[in-house]
Amino acid sequence: MAKAKTPAVANTGAKPPYTFRTAWALLLLGVNFLVAAYYFHIIQ
């Protein structure tokens, strides 16, 4: 098989918008810890 000369992802030099997915990840992680604290009776 011949190698493709173009990359699979276009190299435009643009900064990917990681802030949106990072905000959602931190929010879900916080909710996860909140549910865990409730489950282990750390909070009532």
Curated annotation (Swiss-Prot):
<keyword id="KW-0472">Membrane</keyword>
<keyword id="KW-0812">Transmembrane</keyword>
<keyword id="KW-0602">Photosynthesis</keyword>
<keyword id="KW-1133">Transmembrane helix</keyword>
<comment type="similarity">
    <text>Belongs to the PsaX family.</text>
</comment>
<dbReference type="GO" id="GO:0009522">
    <property type="term" value="C:photosystem I"/>
</dbReference>
<dbReference type="InterPro" id="IPR012986">
    <property type="entry name" value="PSI_PsaX"/>
</dbReference>
<protein>
    <recommendedName>
        <fullName>Photosystem I 4.8 kDa protein</fullName>
    </recommendedName>
</protein>
<dbReference type="Pfam" id="PF08078">
    <property type="entry name" value="PsaX"/>
</dbReference>
<keyword id="KW-0793">Thylakoid</keyword>
<feature type="transmembrane region" description="Helical">
    <location>
        <begin position="23"/>
        <end position="43"/>
    </location>
</feature>
<keyword id="KW-0603">Photosystem I</keyword>
<dbReference type="GO" id="GO:0015979">
    <property type="term" value="P:photosynthesis"/>
</dbReference>
<dbReference type="GO" id="GO:0031676">
    <property type="term" value="C:plasma membrane-derived thylakoid membrane"/>
</dbReference>
<dbReference type="InterPro" id="IPR036243">
    <property type="entry name" value="PSI_PsaX_sf"/>
</dbReference>
